[in-house]
């Protein structure tokens, strides 16, 4: 229709998402969003409502694009490999200069006390979705015997999610993939430890006290010496 500027909603959301991701929610002004999206205030407000509603839509856009690209790796049938691939996707994004630093959800969670309850709920909801996705992979590993049933799958899911969010937080100031790989290597050693535990629990042996071996040897010698020799 003549006189009405047409635009692609997803493209506008991508641009708004990048602006929020780069500057943060509070620091991004309406003028910044107008400049980033290329549409006027009237169209911006008419389509998305206020800044808060646009930000909530940008969070959904982030999850449906950047976030899902990482968590799609969890579909790998090998559970351990699935977790590794999730981390690999995260490292690729974190070390790619075309993306802003950190993660829009992680960055916002650090800023969240000033963002309002609605945004805080959105962050918590997303964290729950991520935790559940990892948890399902771990439960599958327990079902096929590659992860011990004695392990707390929910706690492990929270641990791996914490490592992922930790990488995102570190990424605010560091883009070295070697740093992130070190974090992942240690995290995966936790998996290996959990996988190695037998169903009946780890086999524990009491450490031999220093001197026990020598003491046993002395006792054996004493016993041999106490046996009388037959006289001929």
Regions found by a protein language model. Name each.
Residues 11, 15, 19-53, 57:
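Helix-turn-helix
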Residues 57, 71-101, 153-157:
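Hydrophobic alpha-helical connector segments
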Residues 60-66:
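Short, basic, alpha-helical segments at the C-terminal edge of helix-turn-helix-like DNA-binding modules
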Residues 81-84, 117-143, 154-158, 185:
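Amphipathic alpha-helical packing segments from all-alpha helical-bundle domains
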Residues 82-85, 97-121:
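Amphipathic alpha-helical segments used for helix-helix packing
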Residues 93-96, 140, 160-177, 190-200:
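Amphipathic C-terminal alpha-helical segment
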Residues 101, 106, 151-170, 182-190:
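Hydrophobic alpha-helical segments that form the core
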Residues 208-218, 226-227:
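Short, low-complexity, charge-dense intrinsically disordered segments
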């Amino acid at each position: 229709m003549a006189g009405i500027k047409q635009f692609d909603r997803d493209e506008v959301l991508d641009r708004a998402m990048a602006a929020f991701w780069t500057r943060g929610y509070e620091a991004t002004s309406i003028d910044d969003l107008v400049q980033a999206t290329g549409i006027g205030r009237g169209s911006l407000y008419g389509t998305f409502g206020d800044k808060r509603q646009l930000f909530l839509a940008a969070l959904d856009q982030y999850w449906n694009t950047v976030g899902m690209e990482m968590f799609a790796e969890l579909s790998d049938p090998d559970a351990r490999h699935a977790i590794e691939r999730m981390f690999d996707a995260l490292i690729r994004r974190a070390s790619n200069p075309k993306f802003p630093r950190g993660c829009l959800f992680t960055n916002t969670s650090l800023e969240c006390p000033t963002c309002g309850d609605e945004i805080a709920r959105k962050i918590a909801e997303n964290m729950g979705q991520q935790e559940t996705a990892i948890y399902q992979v771990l439960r599958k590993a327990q079902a096929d015997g590659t992860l011990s049933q004695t392990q707390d799958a929910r706690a492990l899911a929270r641990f791996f999610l914490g490592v992922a969010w930790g990488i995102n937080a570190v990424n605010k100031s560091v883009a070295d993939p070697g740093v992130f790989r070190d974090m992942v290597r240690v995290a995966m050693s936790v998996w290996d430890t959990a996988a190695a535990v037998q169903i009946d629990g780890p086999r524990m042996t009491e450490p031999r006290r220093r001197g026990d071996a020598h003491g046993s040897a002395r006792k054996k010698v004493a016993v041999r010496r106490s046996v009388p020799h037959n006289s001929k």
